[in-house]
């Protein structure tokens, strides 16, 4: 079963989010780029009060851990993200895209 990851950051801006993606060589707007193996879905959003959320589904926690160790950790630093996120994992029991 796939795994759901929710990351909640305090004080991360849209500019920093875009910088991290540029460091990774991915473009969330077009879907093009060097997306990590094991990533199924990626969503990101900003909330009031300077909070940023990333919600992803992965084939396994191990696949995400490998991505974090080999690419994402360094890209976060180079992109200016120094805050440690709140991390929540859950087993994914449903994923639907009714609108397309």
Regions found by a protein language model. Name each.
Residues 75-79:
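Short arginine-rich
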């Amino acid at each position: 079963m796939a795994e759901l990851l929710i990351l909640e950051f305090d004080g991360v801006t849209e500019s920093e989010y875009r910088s991290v993606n540029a460091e990774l060589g991915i473009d969330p707007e077009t879907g093009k780029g060097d997306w990590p193996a094991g990533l199924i879905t990626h969503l990101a959003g900003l909330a009031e009060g300077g909070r940023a959320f990333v919600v992803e589904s992965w084939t396994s926690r191990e696949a995400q851990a490998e991505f974090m160790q080999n690419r994402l950790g360094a890209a976060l630093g180079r992109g200016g993200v120094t805050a440690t996120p709140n991390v929540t994992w859950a087993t994914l029991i449903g994923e639907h895209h009714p609108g397309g």
